[in-house]
Structure formats: structure tokens, C-alpha cells
């Protein structure tokens, strides 16, 4: 249940903790409680998205989201996800040559299919998202605009990325990525009425019912306490300083990788992540003349991920536009929040780029590079 409406006694302090988490979540994004409500009970992002869908759609309704190969998430309508099985999914993408969102295509698809929900947000997109355009497109076809900001919530809270709230009906975020909180999710919903004719419920009320009792039983109160702490930290001056360094580190890493001959999706980054394009043209011969790998020697995302992990560098394989297999894609995703938390700055990012070059292109000894990484990171202990 929810504060004041639990099914069990002895919840006074849990109620106070949950209300505190809600208050801090709204404060982190400068939201008015008169206009917005927030549910802090979702166990993680995937069930949070499904709760939103079940609250606002019927089975077979049209859901529109970013395709997996363009940088979208499974729960945005991929056929392997229940979101693509319960609902008719329409997938939008990016310009193949630039990797940038194709807002003209999004507008045309919305006009053609009239989706019930249009999702903005991505799992692997290194550029800023124009939430205003998404909001305008959704409004033009009578759709709900759901912004999934799971990967960029910390940047938004710090004012380093445009906010989705002025142009969204619902905003969902996980709390364990750039927010640096526990593994969980929160759903922000407008207090305005549902678009369904004759409905007396607000969007927020419908979503609350979908989370509990629709999707979940008892809340994880220990996690909600951690969410309250995460949002408390997100309102402090040091959090903005940290997020600025996250972006600065990502840009430094991107520029250094390009100097070593790597091609990046979209040519760089505006946020905390970047994606290396590992397709056959990923070496810029004019930059690195010594790199003469043949097509047969090119590595896919899975191979690159495993090689780098063996050397002590954790990355994530990532699909690129046109990829058929999410298991062996053509891209490699890198993020800077964790390293930045340890105190790493631009100088170290240049060294990390060099190690990636030596692992993937020069094929140097992985054990040797691992020793070098360990020596550097001894200067940046986790605790």
C-alpha cells in the first residue's frame, strides 16, 4: 500500500520515509506538488515502464518508442519484450549516417499510426534529446508523452541537459545510473485527468493503481530510504560539480579516442556516454597510419567488450543503426560516471583512451595493460 493506506500495521516510520523520498524527488527537479506526483515504489525501470503502459493503454494499443538498434531500450516496444507483445509497437530511429534522432520521421510515424504513448529517451544515445519536440508531436496526435530519462536523470537534475518536465505527461527514471542511488525506479506523473473519456482518475492516480496492486506487492522500504538519500544528495552543490566533471570526462575520452583513430557514433557526446563504431570503417587511416587491420581482423562489440574486460576496462557492447544482432553488435558503449566518482579527471581519460587503443588496435599484452591500470587506480581508491 501507500503512506496512510497500508495493509499492515506498524508502518508509521515507513510512511514518513516514503513521503520524504517523494518530497526530495520533486525538489530535485524543481517540481510543484500541485502539478506533479511521484511514485517511489517501482522495483526497477522495466516494471515501472510496464506499469505506465498498463495504466494508460489497453492490450493492442499502439506504443511508439526508439528502436533497440538506434539506442532505445527493450521496454520501448522491442518484440522480445512484453512491451512489444502486449502492445502494437511502432519504432522510430536515427539518421543512419549521423546517428542523430530523426524528428521528421518521428512526426510522420506519429501522424500515421496515432500511438497512445510516445516514448522519448534512450539507453544508448550520446546527444541531447529535444523533449519539447517530442511533446509537440505527442500533443498533435493526442498521445501521452512519456520521457524515460533513466540514463540522464542526474544531468537533468544538475541543469546540464534540457528538462523533459515542461513537455511531458509522465517521466520515469531509474535511480542507480547518473543519480548514483540504489537499483530502483521512480515515476513522475502529472495530476491532470486521463485522456480517456469520462474517466475521473488523474494520470498519477491511474499509475499508482498500476504499480500497486497492479504490478507489485509490498514496497522495498529499505530501498526507498536509499532513494530519499540519493535525491537529498542530488540537491547539493557538490552534485552539480560532479555531473559537470562527468560530462567533461566523457568529452575528453571522446576526443582522445578520435585521436587514436576510432570513429564515434554521432562524432562525439553531449552527456555521460559515448559509443565507438566498430564497423569496418571504424579506423581513420589519415589519423593512425600504423593501424592496418584487415576486415577479417575487425572486432565486434562482444569481442571488444571481452578483451577490454580481460585488461581491466569495463565497457558495454551496444547496437548501432542497422545491426541485426543485439548479442554481437557493432558498437561499444563507454560511460564516465563511475570513474568520475572515484576522482578520475580529463588527464586520466586520455590514458584510458590510450589503453583502449592498445588493447583493440595494437593488440598488446592484456596482462601488462592490466598492471598499468591497477597502478593508476591505486591513486583512486573506492573507499
Please provide the spans of the model-predicted regions.
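Short, basic, low-complexity termini and linkers enriched in Ser/Thr/Gly/Pro
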Residues: 191-203, 280-295
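A glycine-rich phosphate-binding loop feature that marks nucleotide/adenosyl-phosphate handling sites
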Residues: 228, 245-251, 267-275, 321-326, ...
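Glycine-/proline-rich flexible loop or hinge segments
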Residues: 1-11, 34-36
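Conserved PLP-binding catalytic core of the aspartate aminotransferase-like
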Residues: 263-288, 297-343
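Short acidic (Asp/Glu) and glycine-rich catalytic loops that position anionic groups and cofactors
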Residues: 1-4, 115, 204-209, 224-234, ...
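Conserved PLP-enzyme active-site core in the AAT-like
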Residues: 15-16, 20-261
Amino acid at each position: 500500500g501507500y503512506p496512510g493506506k497500508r495493509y499492515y500495521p506498524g508502518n508509521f516510520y515507513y510512511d514518513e520515509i516514503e513521503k520524504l523520498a517523494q518530497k526530495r524527488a520533486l525538489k530535485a527537479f524543481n517540481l510543484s506538488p500541485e502539478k506533479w506526483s511521484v511514485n517511489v515504489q517501482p522495483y526497477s525501470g522495466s516494471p515501472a515502464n510496464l506499469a505506465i503502459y498498463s495504466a494508460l493503454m489497453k492490450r493492442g494499443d499502439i506504443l511508439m518508442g526508439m528502436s533497440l538498434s538506434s539506442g532505445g531500450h527493450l521496454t520501448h516496444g522491442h518484440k522480445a519484450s512484453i512491451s512489444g507483445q502486449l502492445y502494437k509497437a511502432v519504432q522510430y530511429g536515427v539518421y543512419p549516417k549521423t546517428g542523430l534522432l530523426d524528428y521528421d520521421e518521428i512526426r510522420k510515424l506519429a501522424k500515421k499510426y496515432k500511438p497512445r504513448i510516445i516514448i522519448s529517451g534512450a539507453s544508448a544515445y550520446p546527444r541531447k534529446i529535444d523533449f519539447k519536440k517530442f511533446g509537440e508531436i505527442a500533443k498533435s496526435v493526442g498521445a501521452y508523452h512519456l520521457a524515460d530519462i533513466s540514463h540522464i536523470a542526474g544531468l537533468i537534475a544538475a541543469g546540464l541537459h534540457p528538462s523533459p518536465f515542461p513537455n511531458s505527461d509522465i517521466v520515469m527514471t531509474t535511480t542507480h545510473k547518473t543519480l548514483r542511488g540504489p537499483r530502483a525506479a521512480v515515476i513522475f506523473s502529472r495530476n491532470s485527468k486521463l485522456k480517456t473519456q469520462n474517466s475521473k482518475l488523474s494520470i498519477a492516480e491511474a499509475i499508482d493503481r498500476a504499480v500497486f496492486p497492479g504490478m507489485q506487492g509490498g514496497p522495498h522500504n529499505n530501498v526507498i530510504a536509499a532513494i530519499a538519500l540519493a535525491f537529498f544528495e542530488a540537491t547539493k552543490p557538490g552534485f552539480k560539480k560532479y555531473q559537470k566533471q562527468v560530462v567533461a570526462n566523457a568529452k575528453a575520452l571522446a576526443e582522445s579516442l578520435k585521436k587514436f583513430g576510432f570513429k564515434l557514433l554521432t562524432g562525439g557526446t553531449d552527456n555521460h556516454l559515448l559509443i565507438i563504431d566498430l564497423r569496418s570503417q571504424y579506423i581513420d587511416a589519415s589519423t593512425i597510419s600504423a593501424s592496418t587491420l584487415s576486415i577479417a581482423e575487425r572486432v565486434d562489440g562482444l569481442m571488444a567488450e571481452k578483451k577490454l574486460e580481460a585488461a581491466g576496462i569495463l565497457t558495454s557492447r551496444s547496437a548501432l543503426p542497422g545491426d541485426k544482432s543485439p548479442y554481437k553488435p557493432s558498437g561499444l558503449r563507454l560511460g564516465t560516471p563511475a570513474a568520475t566518482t572515484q576522482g578520475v579527471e580529463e588527464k586520466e581519460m586520455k590514458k584510458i583512451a590510450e589503453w583502449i587503443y592498445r588493447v583493440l588496435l595494437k593488440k598488446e599484452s592484456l596482462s601488462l595493460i592490466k598492471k598499468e591500470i591497477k597502478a593508476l587506480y591505486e591513486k583512486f581508491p573506492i573507499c
